[in-house]
Amino acid sequence: MASIDITSEKTKLHTAYKALDGKRVPSVTTIIGGQLGWNKRVLMAWQKRMAEQGEDPDKIRDKSADIGTLAHYMVEQYLLEREVELGEYSENDIEMAYNALDAFKLWWKDADLEFESAELRLVSEKHRYGGTIDMVSRDKEGNMVLIDFKTSNGIYAEHIIQVAAYGELFEEMREENVKETYILQLSKESDSFHYHRISKKMLTAGWRAFNLLLKLKPLQKKLRM
């Protein structure tokens, strides 16, 4: 059985995925982050704008990541009916993460879905990558529905590629078709949310893109001077 090592249950950033042969495989987010730079110009423009305003863009980015990680953790604990441990986070981070949790609760009460699992960690033996699916659920007909949580201000192409890779990973390892895939965008400023259905056409394109990234990754080392 493939193994998954997690240094902290509150974060996906330190999750190590291993295939059956014991070798480590990269995560979906590592592959996308290392091989794709479609939003590089947007990021550079934002960094320049923050610097001009006297802000440290690295600190802002890291803080946003911390809040997003905490929000994911809170939602997971809520779904599993577990206590939340908040000792290592600031009051501001906790407040913003609770906004995201409140947004999730508002969405969940009318979602008409049956919860099955949270933070499902899987490793693809066929394609040699690992990933953590935020939420697995079923609709009232018993069909499988995958949901990915985002606390970012926008939904980008990278996110589509990510959920496409998760869907293929789930279908390979669980041998069950995924009926629908959604991205649930949770606000950190209020209890508002946006529910994005990802079409089959977009998922197909996302999976094709991810396959190209898988092929590109081994070439990266060969091209270094």
Across the structure, where does each feature detected by a protein language model lie?
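Nucleic-acid nuclease catalytic cores
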Residues: 120-214, 219-225
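Metal-dependent nuclease catalytic cores that hydrolyze phosphodiester bonds in DNA/RNA
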Residues: 1-130, 225
